[in-house]
Amino acid sequence: MKRNIFCHFMKNFHERLDFPPYPGSIGKKIYKNISKKAWEIWKNHQTILINEKQLNMLNKKDRKTIEIEMINFLFKNK
């Protein structure tokens, strides 16, 4: 059975994620407030950012950059 949540990003009810997609409190917040559809949109945007900015996910600074971009993308009003 699909569970719908009010997605903060989409501003509408959509299917909930199956599990927190990110560790820690940020992952819990995403799980409670972001839909599967919005998470897919973020993953596509994340790929573009990594490629355009030539980020290396083995580098801690680059991972922090993506984390900040993710929070801004999913939770900041447009």
Curated annotation (Swiss-Prot):
Domain of life: Bacteria
GO molecular function list: iron ion binding
Keywords assigned: Iron
Residues of the signal peptide: none
Recorded GO CC terms: cytosol
One example of a Gene Ontology biological process annotation: cellular response to oxidative stress
Job of this protein: Could be a mediator in iron transactions between iron acquisition and iron-requiring processes, such as synthesis and/or repair of Fe-S clusters in biosynthetic enzymes.
Subunit structure comment from the entry: Monomer.
Family in the record: Belongs to the Fe(2+)-trafficking protein family.
PANTHER family: FE(2+)-TRAFFICKING PROTEIN-RELATED
Protein name (Swiss-Prot/TrEMBL): Probable Fe(2+)-trafficking protein
Organism the protein comes from: Wigglesworthia glossinidia brevipalpis
